[in-house]
Design a protein with these regions (language model features):
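Bacterial N-terminal signal peptides
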Residues: 8-19
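N-terminal secretory signal peptides that target proteins for export/translocation
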Residues: 1-6
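Conserved beta-strand/short-helix segments
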Residues: 22-510
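Short, low-complexity, Pro/Ser/Thr/Gly-rich segments in the mature regions of secreted, periplasmic
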Residues: 521-528
């Protein structure tokens, strides 16, 4: 299968992942207790059956699709067979309530049951590879964007980089929300024009770029041709699209390219909206994880652009964060997250380099946080985090700390908090998630903690990659965000069939505080209260 991977939007955080080998099989996943929920295709009330390679949970997005004040959760399974086509992909949507996640109210989408897609399901399309949620048409209901980056629409001429064949052009579905939820009869499909290709929909985000109250749709195309370095190279592009009253998506302006990037830079590999511009004005960040910086190949960089005119506001490399250095294959810009960690009203930007050799340990990973200011993102006000900041065992080779990021106000104190996925952490890539609180002085390094599947009532599994995908949103409408954790390599009904955990108010002091451990596994198949 082609490579997979994470992206974010303010408040609504989405993610996707890179698959690895799967391990031994485990049992099905039930839905819920008072603190945590767990869902797979084998959960009671969920349509479908887990099968090997489904990768359920490979993409996640929270949005309020029915406008009831409680967030809803979209889950991508890009390896799902649909219409008899292997790896065609499908998306599940579970609706939230004051009681949390309920598997009884769901919708399932694939390319065969949505209008406007003449090609329908095809093997290898991977519909649901990336997801994003937000209100694009301004009607008060969030809409859902679904990326299908490996859709086959032959691209004429040229050679393709990005380890993709030239027919991996891709497209994006936009399903509109309503009082009854997502409306499968009201769908737009955006496809590249002419010879433009390059895995459209590999990353997605929705946010308001022009201040009119309606969200723009940001589409990452990391394998696309662009004018760069005095020529046309496959460095990647990013497009911001707005909803037009005639029922179409139109460009909001800007070039959609970074003129300073080279062939195979993969700009648009990850994207994020935020108030990154002067005075907190809206802009977007895009990661180019393969960009060469100061002679270091594939060390990566992040560009911040004004989405309306395409002006490059800032380019960030690891050397912009104090004494941090660039090295080949760091992949800085692999994952991005937006949050106001110090509560000053200006958005801050977290950017990961999960293959960074921290303290000499290969591919252990680092995350860089640049704080916002009245003049925009200020990399001179920064923090650098790694596993070493959490005490306990030191970093190990292949931890990939920061391979997924999610930001939101998890503890309800008014400051955004930051979660880090480390899917390679633990024996045989079991995976861990790390967490730090926000505060008036920023992220509180030294007061964070980590957890794994057993912390949430599950069981360790080799190669599960717990934490490969993260997302945050307010599932129960109480004003504080929940965390969703995708485990797309989990063996529920077959190797790498996948599952998703959702947890709220996680705190080391209450993880066993609601009594579920005394009841054994029974609560984990109970109906959520």
């Amino acid at each position: 299968m082609p490579q997979r991977l994470s992206t974010t939007v303010p408040i609504l955080v989405v993610g996707f992942f890179v698959p690895f080998a799967a391990g031994a099989q485990t049992g099905a996943c039930g839905v819920g207790n008072v603190r945590n929920w767990c869902v797979s295709q084998d959960s009671a009330g969920v349509t479908g059956v887990s099968q090997a390679g489904d990768h359920f949970g490979a993409a996640l997005a929270f949005g309020d699709f029915d406008g009831d004040g409680a967030g809803d959760l979209a889950v991508g399974a890009p390896g799902e067979s649909a219409g008899g086509a292997a790896n065609a992909g499908a998306v599940w949507v579970f609706y939230g309530s004051a009681a949390g996640l309920h598997a009884g109210r769901e919708q399932v989408f694939d390319q065969d049951n949505l209008p406007g897609d003449d090609g329908g399901t095809e093997s290898g399309d991977q519909f649901g590879f990336a997801l994003a949620a937000g209100d694009v048409d301004g009607d008060g209901f969030d809409d859902l964007a679904i990326g299908t980056p490996f859709e086959n629409q032959p691209e004429p001429g040229g050679t393709c980089g990005f380890d993709l064949s030239c027919d991996d052009v891709g497209h994006v579905h936009l399903i509109f929300g309503s009082a009854s939820g997502l409306d499968a009869g009201r769908v737009l499909v955006h496809t590249p024009e002419g010879s433009e290709g390059g895995a459209e929909g590999y990353s997605l985000a929705i946010g308001d770029l022009d201040g009119d109250g309606d969200g723009e749709l940001l589409i990452g195309k990391p394998g696309s041709m662009a004018v760069s370095l005095g020529g046309t190279v496959r460095s990647g592009r990013v497009f911001a699209l707005r909803y037009h009253g005639s029922g179409t998506l139109v460009g909001s302006g800007g070039s959609g390219q970074d003129p300073d990037l080279e062939e195979d830079a993969q700009w648009g590999f990850a994207v994020a909206f935020g108030g990154f511009g002067p005075g907190g004005s809206a802009a977007y960040a895009a990661g180019a994880r393969h960009s060469t910086v100061a002679g270091s190949t594939r060390t990566g960089r992040v560009s911040i652009q004004d989405g309306l005119d395409g002006e490059n506001l800032l380019e960030l490399a690891q050397t912009d964060y104090g004494s941090a250095g660039n090295a080949a294959e760091d992949h800085f810009g692999f994952a991005l997250a937006t949050g106001d960690f110090d509560g000053d009203g200006f958005d801050d930007l977290a950017a990961a380099a999960p293959e960074k050799n921290d303290a000499g340990v290969g591919d252990s990973g680092r995350v860089y946080v640049a704080y916002g200011s009245p003049s925009g993102i200020d990399p001179s006000q920064f923090q650098i985090l790694s596993i070493a900041d959490f005490g306990g065992n030191p970093p190990d080779t292949g931890d990939r700390f920061g391979a997924a990021l999610a930001a939101g106000d998890y503890d309800g104190d008014g400051f955004d908090d930051l979660f880090f996925g480390s899917p390679g952490r633990g024996n045989d890539d079991r995976g861990f998630v790390y967490f730090v609180h926000g505060s008036a002085s920023g992220l509180v390094i030294g007061a964070g903690f980590n957890f794994s599947e057993p912390s949430l009532g599950g069981a360790f599994q080799e190669d599960a990659l717990f934490g490969a995908v993260l997302a945050m949103g307010d599932l129960d409408g109480d004003g504080a965000d929940e965390l969703a954790i995708g485990v797309p390599e989990k063996d529920t009904g077959g190797n790498a069939s996948g599952l998703v955990y959702v947890t709220r108010r996680f705190n080391p002091n209450w993880i066993f505080g609601d009594g579920f451990e005394s009841a054994g596994p029974a609560l984990w198949s109970a109906t959520a209260p």
